């Protein structure tokens, strides 16, 4: 028996060995192949010495899964989850267990990527299409997006859309009714300031008194009142005002739709459709508009097209509106959205169906009726005369009521003017109403819930005026009327899941996306009620576990980035960019340099960079790159000097989007600083920095961090994500604040960029666990292994494909770019053909045509083993051999396995397949690996042009189900 010390035996459970794909033998074999003695030797060959850290991170030691779970369990236990009646856009909900287990906790759903490859994403595309159908049915409008980040940012997007499409071109005022949620107004004001819009706040009826391009109303309002806006909206629209409405999704089940009142845009949070509050998120926002505004819609839209066989197929429609194509001219900077949460909400609607939703909404409303009737019977005066779920009260002894509420472990809404609000939800029970009577009235009130209910049944309720009761049918599509049994629902979810390729099947080597392991142990705490069920506006002394977790995570991120402070609020990487640029903007303004509004951006930048700069009110000036893909220093010097007086910042990614560590990065920072600008270092490629270098050490002033890339939050098929920003001390006073929750930061006076003060706090435990489990050495080794895997793949493939960019010592960083343009010229085979052919080999394609058209960018991450890397390499080598057959003329350029990829079961069953110059086996079993573990695309190649020319973004017609 091997003699091992106890210390060595204790290392067996360390998370590090679970997270990193290659074992020690595989690592050594790979090191030998690439020509390095060790990971340290490889690091020295790749990372410029001038920016390498001389000290280790100060995170702590790696630990085992059991130890990590025990620690975070202690944090969770510090949270006191009181019964919440705060409302304000966040409500208790019952997550159906069939959805919790089969979607939220299922890697088949949460590890997929944004469906840029729709042929292997038909399942979640159908689920998202269902979400769009729910959104359109409930709002009464024509076209819905696939989700936005939250209700408040959706409001800001609605304002921007209003300005784009309004015929009142000279108007510069956006009106906001004074009864919207305060966090929504906060985010709208932040965005309006960047655009130079004037925001006027007042009673809804006063909107007609201004020359407006747009207006925003809340339905129902923050106090619970339901208003019929039909006449007001008609008056405003006659004046070319774009009318936008923030709506409660559950109330719309019972209420007249805003679309039928004349609204142009309706948006809101889908949280109460089966998504936990999570101390603020993540939650999907719905966004719906009139068809005439479709080209100005923000975010992703799922549409129906057809595949090569003419069969119905789904895809992301009208992508030319988006940041990755239009850059600074895009409608929005949105990239990551909230697809996983939108899918949960859509499944919630499918599972309950229209009748179930009406029962839930009616029960909520009945409890509100009972509560109101009881209080009014005791002489309590209500602020609102109509309601769906919320009543507001004045004239109470607020201190006494609050004391009784806290003693009963419940939170009410207490406004600064003494108004007390109570919002009921799906989780409300009869006993809760009894307890609320006790809290408001004191003991001995003598009210009986059953008696009050009988009175309401007998006399009727006027809480929803007859004119505002929904008369039209909702969710009549068969999808929402056939899966109400759990057996059927479970099978429907599984049927959709089986159509999608996710990390639980194979590597997803998307460059600049960092599709690493999302370990089960990291995901576990997210479902715990202590984290999942806390309202974001709960008193902070009830959220001590969350507070400590956020403080510890922030401290670790400060250490990892080399910055001085971190702001957790942004809900995505793109929102992080926006928040970071706002901090820069406010910093310049504080120094009397408000005129500094020019943002330098290299040609190779991510599309979100110029889109975010435009969003922050900056002017983009593009700088050139040299033939090696590096920033052209001479061009940068020239342009920095030319715009020096107005230079705000540069946005640069490191390592570069070309996959190399630029030797001149510090000189780039110095050039910008010398001309009075700040350095924004995009954190998209942070997976190649952690433990080896840092943005702060390099010389940057601010960065966002993609927690859904570097720090293990799953991509969810297109969200959630988080984009906290790290800043140097001089920018710390200018990060996002929040109007509702003010934990005493210096930046609290600043506007918000997200609805919740800590963004999507409910998924922060994932990144906390990732860092805690890996520790200082584990984080560093993860980065080094990512470099090893990328260089191994690069060197293997370089024998078959040209590698476009390499850094020092002929190395790449954590990703590499192969150039397909010579092959395309010689054979006619395109990068799209190769991407689709990889589906037949069981792989998602790498990133296509970014940052250079006609290329593939490959990022394997540290979590992939040598076995999986070799399988991918073998597939690419085999595809190269197939291309050679096209080059030689053996296969026609328009009839070969690449041109016809991906192949489906329908292909091999087709009698006409025999006319093809290749066999069925070549088509669907091109490698030995897929013979025993085949992923089958369910549609053939999709016709993108047809889908955009014949736009349809709703569920299939009823005839498809006959």
Curated annotation (Swiss-Prot):
GO annotation, biological process: glycine decarboxylation via glycine cleavage system
Cofactor(s) needed: pyridoxal 5'-phosphate
Keywords, comma-separated and alphabetical: Oxidoreductase, Pyridoxal phosphate
The keyword Disulfide bond is assigned to this record: no
GO CC annotations, alphabetized: cytosol; glycine cleavage complex
PTM annotation (N6-(pyridoxal phosphate)lysine): residues: 709
Enzyme Commission number(s): 1.4.4.2
An MF annotation (GO) of this entry: glycine binding
InterPro entries linked to this entry: GcvP, GDC-P_C, GDC-P_N, GDC_P, PyrdxlP-dep_Trfase, PyrdxlP-dep_Trfase_major, PyrdxlP-dep_Trfase_small
Reaction it catalyzes: N(6)-[(R)-lipoyl]-L-lysyl-[glycine-cleavage complex H protein] + glycine + H(+) = N(6)-[(R)-S(8)-aminomethyldihydrolipoyl]-L-lysyl-[glycine-cleavage complex H protein] + CO2
Stored PANTHER family: GLYCINE DEHYDROGENASE (DECARBOXYLATING) (PTHR11773:SF13), GLYCINE DEHYDROGENASE, DECARBOXYLATING (PTHR11773)
Function field: The glycine cleavage system catalyzes the degradation of glycine. The P protein binds the alpha-amino group of glycine through its pyridoxal phosphate cofactor; CO(2) is released and the remaining methylamine moiety is then transferred to the lipoamide cofactor of the H protein.
Family designation: Belongs to the GcvP family.
Oligomeric form and interacting partners: The glycine cleavage system is composed of four proteins: P, T, L and H.
Protein name: Glycine dehydrogenase (decarboxylating)
Biological classification of the source: Bacteria, Pseudomonadati, Pseudomonadota, Gammaproteobacteria, Alteromonadales
